[in-house]
Amino acid sequence: MYNLIIFLPLIGAILSWILGNRFSSIPTYIVSISCLFLSMIISWIAFYDIAILKNDFEGVSLPWINSGEFRALWEFNFDTLSCVMFLVVNTVSAMVHLYSVGYMSHDKSKARFMAYLSFFTFAMLMLVSSNNLLQLFFGWEGVGVASYLLIGFWYNKKSATSAAVKAFLVNRVGDLGLSLIHISEPTRPSQ
């Protein structure tokens, strides 16, 4: 059940994108906000169960990359720190989604905005729950792409596109930092 914390925002993003192309903005709002609030509620439950009651939870663990001696698993970390981050990310994101209903009421691209926002939440959750550096890198890149899309949302404004490119370039500095960490600490991504 706790795996839904991570995947509900992705489901919300995909459905928002699909529904937004076919229907009015109301179904898009309902789907994306429902997915986020459900993810937030499960985050609070996970926080209580794992951080307060100290119960263990094994998340998804799937073979991802096998190449010679290199092996990487796709797995999520559910410990106290991750649960605190789930709580913070999902609670803030749910409130931002709710606020966006009024803020974006004048815009014609509401569905696209909600899809980008839900994708940003998913990428952030992937980042904070990753159990190895390779998966963390994918979460980091997802956050970078989502930031670029959100900052440059009003792409017809020169200031928005300029700021989006600037954010994208700054994110490359983070990529360099992650690469330097990997080079200086050459450990196996998964045990």
What are these regions (language model features)?
Residues 1-7, 11-12:
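Membrane-embedded, hydrophobic transmembrane alpha-helices
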Residues 9, 79, 116-119, 126-178:
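Functional transmembrane alpha-helices
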Residues 181-191:
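Single conserved hydrophobic/aromatic residue that forms the stacking wall/gate
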Residues 1, 15, 19-115, 184:
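Transmembrane helix-loop-helix hairpins at membrane boundaries of multipass inner-membrane proteins
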